[in-house]
Amino acid sequence: MASQGTKRSYEQMETGGERQNATEIRASVGRMVGGIGRFYIQMCTELKLSDYEGRLIQNSITIERMVLSAFDERRNKYLEEHPSAGKDPKKTGGPIYRRRDGKWVRELILYDKEEIRRIWRQANNGEDATAGLTHLMIWHSNLNDATYQRTRALVRTGMDPRMCSLMQGSTLPRRSGAAGAAVKGVGTMVMELVRMIKRGINDRNFWRGENGRRTRVAYERMCNILKGKFQTAAQRAMMDQVRESRNPGNAEIEDLIFLARSALILRGSVAHKSCLPACVYGLAVASGYDFEREGYSLVGIDPFRLLQNSQVFSLIRPNENPAHKSQLVWMACHSAAFEDLRVSSFIRGTRVVPRGQLSTRGVQIASNENMETMDSNTLELRSRYWAIRTRSGGSTNQQKSSAGQISVQPTFSVQRNLPFERATIMAAFTGNTEGRISDMRTEIIRMMESARPEDVSFQGRGVFELSDEKATNPIVPSFDMSNEGSYFFGDNAEEYDN
């Protein structure tokens, strides 16, 4: 990779820093999550939450959403210019759940955004701490990835629901910066670009004038982000072509969808980081842990350690299975919605089941749900082993871009084979030659055809005991090679709707 010299690690993106050494990165990431923890503690004090209520993941999510909303400048400006009935642009709030006489009750709270911003800045040494905000966005995005399916969104942009494993980060806001771009899947980027091109087709002024210039810059930037996710020269060359198009239209949409399909075998590199709910950082800070001094990494043992000794609760609906609710949150915490279930199960130490078999709905509770019947349970977020998170698509033989893993986007750097049904994927390409420049297409299809399902990815990489913090003794698991585990098989999850 030619750009290796300029690549920043994701901790640097996360903290907005320039190139730093490992210790500085650990310290600045530590400062970021410590700030989130301090903010959370302060909010619990403001809201007079008991210890138990403060550990409730639904309360954590409400508090996180309030601070994200308080700092959403674009939306705040929009709300002030377009006042809508019953929405105070200067206030933010949400449901807080309290324990009263052995029952859970919902209380809707409202706060001045200014006040929330003040508390957040105070917890972050007076700074805006955008990195911490992005971190919370990524946690929400990971939770959405584990909870909802995006079939409708895929179909609307002309993609195939089978491409769901490319959709990591599809609910991240546009303002999530470099750290957000790093965790977006190939399908997510393609979808954003296709939507943009469609707007340009329908609205003549989209690419024109002063605004059009800004639009064009955004378009090219998104193309470059997507290009950087591809690992083969032919895929990148096609991206150059899409980016340089004078007037992007249907030909570009065709090319992008072709590229998205190709990413099912020639995986893009997508970053994974373990972003935890604010209450987890709050608990650690409250117990006297100094994140900045100790240092912290989103891709190593630290999040596993933290979850190992945090007790987090969740509201449970009458017919939900608490173990399944725990699995959902565990996957969200480790950004493992698109990981092979064989790998996740091994690391977690308990069987991780596909989403179609989960008896649980999302974590958030709608305002019209009946609280009378709500119970709460401890979430089991501990793991048997830990593993390093990856930012590659799992290409085999020394990252020479051959096959990555289909219908999964590997999260953990752990050796596994890549079982995939080549026939199914190649079927998606038959007769689809009407785009342009068929030589790049031919090259991409040739690479896909030569990918072998028995290839091993992440060769020699293993998991580690939780006592092995320096990652000295990798344990390389052996998996049943015939059996691929995608989380999305037999899917019946709800759609994600804003």
Curated annotation (Swiss-Prot):
Its main location: virion. Residues 1-21 are annotated as: Disordered. Keywords: Capsid protein, Helical capsid protein, Host nucleus, Host-virus interaction, Ribonucleoprotein, RNA-binding, Viral nucleoprotein, Viral penetration into host nucleus, Virion, Virus entry into host cell. GO terms for molecular function: RNA binding; structural molecule activity. It is found in: Virion; Host nucleus. GO terms for biological process: symbiont entry into host cell; viral penetration into host nucleus. Late in virus-infected cells, may be cleaved from a 56-kDa protein to a 53-kDa protein by a cellular caspase. This cleavage might be a marker for the onset of apoptosis in infected cells or have a specific function in virus host interaction. Belongs to the influenza viruses nucleoprotein family. This is Nucleoprotein. It comes from Influenza A virus (strain A/Fowl plague virus/Dobson/'Dutch'/1927 H7N7). The gene is NP.
